[in-house]
Curated annotation (Swiss-Prot):
SMART domains: KU (SM00131). GO terms for molecular function: serine-type endopeptidase inhibitor activity; toxin activity. This is Kunitz serine protease inhibitor Pr-mulgin 3. PANTHER family: KUNITZ-TYPE PROTEASE INHIBITOR-RELATED.
Amino acid sequence: MSSGGLFLLLGLLTLWEVLTPVSSKDRPKFCELPADSGSCKGNFQAFYYHPVHRTCLEFIYGGCEGNDNNFKTIDECKRTCAT
């Protein structure tokens, strides 16, 4: 196989790994928790996984407490929880 073919194969395998969804059996249990802004009064953009819609959505996090279904970026949420 030529070096171009190897690079293509490596690229396709990498793309497959990135785009393959997290299966529900591999998804952490905290991904099923509801969005929880916590008890503090801050105003921070955060993201949580919504299991019914099977996507990550934005919410406002107060800055303390809450639960583990709380991500700083939508990409982090998707990598961890999205199917």
